[in-house]
């Protein structure tokens, strides 16, 4: 037996030689002369590995979010909690079925190169069909969440007609998206059961485009509506972190980013590995809703109401003007203050005050933690009360009914608060 090393090929000394362009000869359904380069083979392997990584990350992130939600949520029977739980469970189930698909012969390199149908078992086809059906249910849960947010943002709003119209459009678009995904899944299974090598790219592409369109449309509606609402609240001096801010964060994180990713998935070349962007967009849409809700709720628990336009400060257990020493002195400058604020509030149209305007409560942040789950929206405070007894956080413990005569208290901010209350409850058709 000779110990001499085998001679090296002349290509070893050629610096311009690319081994990735070397060909492999194998037998396929087209005969014995089938060839493939090492670069093409490596591309198939990289595509499978990339899909496995993305679905592994998706499964782990969804499972972790599901556990955290069960640990932190205080109310588990609200619609938003149920929708989030269903979406997370479906994304875990879909990822698990996709793992089975990746490990089956259907997704193997052998079948991709040779194309022999006898290499595919009926169990592999069943897993493929179940994966498509779970994907339909996942898209349905995402669309339900989007339509639910559209409904929530217009609940109790003065724009009832516009809100009903936009909710109907969103619902129709969501139904069309889910229907197209269902048609794509059924058509794909029918074709696959007859011929495992057949595909239905037309229906799948149409369903993905509809999903991207629905996300783009509903994100635009939510963001525009919420920006207008928050602008109005800031104009009134409300700086606390409430339901409008929570929904704005949810809409930005869970809708705008997936919209951009969906657009990139169709604008970039598929050979650059952009086919997994659709999976990333779906993951962000499912994860961001509960994560944003929990983060916003935690921020609310530590926040306090703070107003910009208030001229009052608290001293001991009573409520006194913060800058002047008496109500007589305050009344002198009140006309100038209310006049300036009235001109500012006149930037927005007003309507006649209704009876319900007199029963609004002061906004507190202690109940805001469950705001996103109960769909409750707080109102502006009533500056004065027609009753003798004072209530609220500034109630005087030493005050007894009947000790003083009923008087009409007029503070420096009475006129301004009246204008703010009118504006907040108005039916503003110009926004």
Curated annotation (Swiss-Prot):
Q: Which residues are glycosylated?
A: 25, 32
Instruction: Quote the cellular component terms of the Gene Ontology held in the record.
Output: G protein-coupled receptor homodimeric complex; plasma membrane
What does the UniProt entry list as the effect of changing residue 236 to H/R?
Answer: Disrupts the interaction with G-protein complex and reduces cell responsiveness to alpha-factor
A biological process (GO) annotation for this entry?
pheromone-dependent signal transduction involved in conjugation with cellular fusion
Q: Which InterPro entries match?
A: GPCR_STE2 (IPR000366), STE2_TM1-TM2_sf (IPR027458)
Q: What post-translational modification information does the record give?
A: Undergoes hyperphosphorylation of the C-terminal cytoplasmic domain after binding of the alpha-factor, which leads to internalization by endocytosis. Monoubiquitination at Lys-337 triggers internalization of STE2.
Result when mutating residue 266 to A/S/L/K: Impairs signal transduction
Gene Ontology molecular function: mating-type alpha-factor pheromone receptor activity; mating-type factor pheromone receptor activity
Pinpoint the Glycyl lysine isopeptide (Lys-Gly) (interchain with G-Cter in ubiquitin) cross-link.
Answer: 337, 374, 400, 422
**What are the entry keywords?**
Cell membrane, G-protein coupled receptor, Glycoprotein, Isopeptide bond, Membrane, Pheromone response, Phosphoprotein, Receptor, Transducer, Transmembrane, Transmembrane helix, Ubl conjugation
PTM sites of type Phosphothreonine: 329, 363, 382, 411, 414
Q: Which residues carry this modification: Phosphoserine?
A: 310, 315, 331, 360, 366, 385-386
**Segments on the Cytoplasmic face:** 73-78, 157-163, 231-241, 300-431
Q: Where is the composition biased (Polar residues)?
A: 379-389
Query: Changing residue 266 to C: what effect?
Result: Dominant negative mutation that inhibits the response to mating pheromone in cells that also express wild-type receptors
> Phenotype of the disruptant?
Strongly affects mating efficiency.
Instruction: Tell me the function of this protein.
Output: Fungal class D1 G-protein-coupled receptor that acts as an alpha-factor pheromone receptor performing pheromone-dependent signal transduction involved in cellular conjugation, mating projection assembly, and in cell fusion. Following alpha-factor-binding, the signal is transmitted via a tripartite G protein consisting of alpha-, beta- and gamma-subunits (GAP1, STE4 and STE8 respectively) that prepares the cell for conjugation. In the inactive state, the cytoplasmic end of transmembrane domain 7 (TMD7) is unstructured and packs between TMD1-6, blocking the G protein coupling site.
Kindly give the PANTHER family that the UniProt entry links to this protein.
PHEROMONE ALPHA FACTOR RECEPTOR
Name assigned to this protein: Pheromone alpha factor receptor
The species this protein belongs to is Saccharomyces cerevisiae (strain ATCC 204508 / S288c) (Baker's yeast)
| Gene assigned in the entry | STE2
């Amino acid at each position: 037996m000779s110990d001499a090393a085998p001679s090296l090929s002349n290509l070893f000394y050629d610096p311009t030689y690319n081994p990735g362009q070397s060909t492999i000869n194998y037998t396929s359904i087209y005969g014995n002369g089938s060839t493939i380069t090492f670069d093409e083979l490596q591309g198939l392997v990289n595509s499978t590995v990339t899909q496995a990584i993305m679905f592994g990350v998706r499964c782990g992130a969804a499972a972790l979010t599901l556990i955290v939600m069960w640990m932190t949520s205080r109310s588990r029977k609200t619609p938003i909690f149920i929708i989030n739980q269903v979406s997370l469970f479906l994304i875990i189930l879909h990822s698990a079925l996709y793992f089975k698909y990746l490990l089956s012969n259907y997704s193997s390199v052998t079948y991709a190169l040779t194309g022999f149908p006898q290499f595919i078992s009926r169990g592999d086809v069943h897993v493929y069909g179940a994966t498509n059906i779970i994907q339909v249910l996942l898209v349905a849960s995402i669309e339900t969440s989007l339509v639910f947010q559209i409904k929530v943002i217009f609940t109790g709003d003065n724009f009832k007609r516009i809100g009903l119209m936009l909710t109907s459009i969103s619902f129709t678009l969501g139904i069309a998206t889910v229907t197209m995904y269902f048609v794509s899944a059924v058509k794909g299974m029918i074709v696959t059961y007859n011929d495992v090598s057949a595909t239905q790219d037309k229906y799948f592409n149409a369903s993905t485009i509809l999903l991207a369109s629905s996300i783009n449309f509903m994100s635009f509606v939510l963001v525009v509506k919420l920006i207008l609402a928050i602008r109005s609240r800031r104009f009134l001096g409300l700086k606390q972190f409430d339901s409008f801010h929570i929904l704005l964060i949810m809409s930005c994180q869970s809708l705008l980013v997936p919209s951009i990713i969906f657009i990139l998935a169709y604008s970039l070349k598929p050979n650059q590995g952009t086919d997994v962007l659709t999976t990333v967009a779906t993951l962000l849409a499912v994860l961001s809703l509960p994560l944003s809700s929990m983060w916003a709720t935690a921020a609310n628990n530590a926040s306090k109401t703070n107003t910009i336009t208030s001229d009052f400060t608290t001293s001991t257990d009573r409520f006194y003007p913060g800058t002047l020493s008496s109500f007589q002195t305050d009344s002198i400058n009140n006309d100038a203050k209310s006049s300036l604020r009235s001109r500012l509030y006149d930037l927005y149209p007003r309507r006649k005050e209704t009876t319900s305007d007199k029963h609004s409560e002061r906004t507190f942040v202690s109940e805001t933690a469950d705001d996103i789950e109960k769909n409750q929206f707080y109102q502006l405070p009533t500056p004065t009360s027609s009753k003798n007894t004072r209530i609220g956080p500034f109630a005087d413990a030493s005050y007894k009914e009947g000790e003083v005569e009923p008087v009409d208290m007029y503070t420096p901010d009475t006129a301004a608060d009246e204008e703010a209350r009118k504006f907040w409850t108005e039916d503003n058709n110009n926004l």
